[in-house]
Swiss-Prot record:
Gene for this chain: hemA
Family classification: Belongs to the glutamyl-tRNA reductase family.
Main EC class the enzyme belongs to: oxidoreductase
Gene3D superfamilies: Glutamyl-tRNA reductase, N-terminal domain (3.30.460.30), NAD(P)-binding Rossmann-like Domain (3.40.50.720)
Protein name stated in the entry: Glutamyl-tRNA reductase
Protein task: Catalyzes the NADPH-dependent reduction of glutamyl-tRNA(Glu) to glutamate 1-semialdehyde (GSA).
The organism's taxonomic lineage, starting at the top: Bacteria, Pseudomonadati, Aquificota, Aquificia, Aquificales
């Protein structure tokens, strides 16, 4: 049995190709079922996000599994098989295990350390479990991958450093104010940057979010999404004095907020600090606003310095994480290899037990005067001898399970305990001997 990974992601395929393979929630069940019905596939799970569509599974024939999956994905996406294959990666064994671990730990993400992938990874496993397309091996693989992810995040702090402008803005606000639960926020602008900032602020538990935009409908839409209030653009200055944090992200060509505005606001707020983040290009807040007492202005370049520094720190953390990940991949691979030889070990022990039972039956028939206790003691002694004799071969098999040439040793031992050595042959030989004696 081999673990495999096949699919595409932001590294291998452009967004227009990824879009064609995007799998919606209501399509996922059918696709899981279809792939799980492939004879060479024993377990399967699908991870589908905006940046990747990847299929993880267990197979006894990787080539057949890959070929069948590509056919299914080709039919699903409408892309020709040979066109689709240009964008696909195909991994087996250790490489597949390592890739899956890296994905769950966010080491393969577009933004290293981003936390969303953990939830997406869990959801992929939960869905596969609901559809009964995962069993023992993938269950352990996902459990270990999530444990590794948690261990890496805890020990390296890889997710703690802001690496987006919007997130950095919120982290900066936390440094200035500490607790944000009693702070009002005003978003000036309702574009993508403002939306990202609103998302981070909302998850940080701010008191209230006001949204103002020249197009009022956009302000209403964004405010409703985060339980805030929409403000008409011409009413902006009525709400500025109530705002502790102001995030500006508009397309204006010149400053909207000026020094004189905040001098008046400072008087109304009686010295309570105001934190302003201008992530507009060109800047929408006049630079001399920073000269007003209790007003703290940061622009996109200030935040970029923070982001660049944090990106470098994340890269260093990622190097440390890679070392931890390699160790865990080795452990899982060792477990999987031992699992592969488990049937052989069971076969050898079953063979020994059959011999034990047969020989004891013969012995007890020849010695009918033995009582139950004596028979039990003899049986225990024979079992102990068998366990002693089989201990070293068992350890030998487990040790060889992780070697590159393990199949050579496994085949030899499997042949030794194959049907030509089985108990039926032994019984037949003894029956012939008895016939000759008679």
């Amino acid at each position: 049995m081999e673990i495999f990974a096949v699919g595409l992601n932001y590294k291998t395929a452009p967004v227009d190709v990824r879009e064609k393979l995007a799998i919606s929630e209501d399509q996922l069940s059918g696709l899981l079922k279809k792939i799980s019905e492939i004879n060479s596939i024993y377990e399967v799970s699908i991870l589908s996000t905006c940046n990747r569509v990847e299929i993880y599974g267990v197979t006894d024939d990787p080539d057949d599994a890959f070929n069948r999956i590509v056919q299914i994905l080709s039919s699903y996406s409408g892309l020709q098989k040979n066109e689709l294959e240009k964008y696909l990666f195909k991994l087996t064994g250790r490489e597949a295990i390592k890739h899956i671990f890296k994905v769950s730990a966010s080491l393969d993400s577009m933004v290293i350390g981003e936390p969303q992938i953990v939830c997406q990874f869990k959801d992929a496993f939960t869905k596969a479990r609901e559809e009964k397309t995962v069993r023992h091996i993938l269950t352990r693989l996902f459990d270990k991958a999530l444990n590794v992810s948690k261990k890496i995040r805890t020990s390296t702090g890889i997710s703690k450093r802001a690496v987006s402008i919007s997130y950095a803005a919120v982290e900066l606000a936390k440094k200035i104010f500490g607790d944000l639960s009693d702070k009002n926020v005003l978003l000036l602008g309702a574009g993508e940057m403002a939306e990202l900032a609103a998302r981070h602020l909302s998850s940080s538990g701010v008191k209230h979010i006001f949204v103002s935009n020249r197009t009022f409908e956009k302000a209403v839409q964004l405010a409703e999404e985060f339980g805030g209030s929409a403000i008409r653009f011409d009413k902006l200055f009525e709400f500025l004095p109530e705002s502790d944090i102001v995030i500006v992200s508009t397309g204006a060509k010149e400053p909207i907020l000026r020094k004189e505005h905040f001098e008046e606001i400072n008087r109304i707020r009686k010295g309570d600090p105001v934190f302003i983040i201008d992530i507009s290009v060109p800047r929408n807040v006049a630079e001399d606003v920073n000269d007003v007492d209790n007003v703290y202005l940061y622009n996109i370049d200030d935040l970029k310095v923070v982001v660049d520094k944090n990106l470098e720190e994340r890269k260093l953390a990622a190097l440390s994480a890679e070392m931890m990940l390699d160790e865990e991949v080795h452990k899982f691979e060792h477990w999987l290899n031992q699992l592969k030889v488990a049937p052989l070990i069971t076969k050898i022990r079953n063979y020994a037990d059959e011999i034990r039972e047969y020989q004891l039956e013969k012995l007890f028939n020849q010695m009918p005067y033995l009582n139950e206790k004596e028979r039990e003691n003899i049986d225990l002694a024979v079992r102990a001898i068998i366990n002693k004799l089989l201990h070293r071969p068992t350890m030998y098999i487990k040790d060889k399970a992780s070697k590159e040439n393990k199949d050579f040793y496994v085949d030899i031992l499997d042949e030794m305990f194959s049907s030509k050595w089985d108990l039926r042959k032994l019984k037949e030989k003894e029956k012939k001997k008895n016939v000759k004696k008679d």
